[in-house]
């Protein structure tokens, strides 16, 4: 191959993208992956904390905890299918329990919300990660509150007490 053809080959990028575009896409994919991991891990950990509290404070055994898990999965599936939104769940919790899930989630201290995830968060992305963690906590509070109120006939006081124990 001649030198001219070799130079031309080096300039050409795969798939018609420039090197900068490829790097930008890789960075975006990496941040999306990190965000998804952060949300999933925090959701899993807050779920485990709530199960421990329901077991210790309210005497829930394996069967009732699995019923809570089943009801929450049903809510998540209907939310994913578009039949129910998290705003509707928050409204339902506000109407039935008199508790604002968003306000409760915002009462969780910023630094302590990062204890829900094992991975270290880069200092530059702390604000956005904190917002994602607060949203994850808010969504789980709404799911759990509606589940306990409708599925187990918890009183307003019991739901509020459960959310307070989860916060600490």
What is each model feature region?
Residues 68-77, 162-167:
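Amphipathic alpha-helical segments that form the core helices of the histone-fold
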Residues 5-50, 78, 84-145:
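Intrinsic disorder/low-complexity detector
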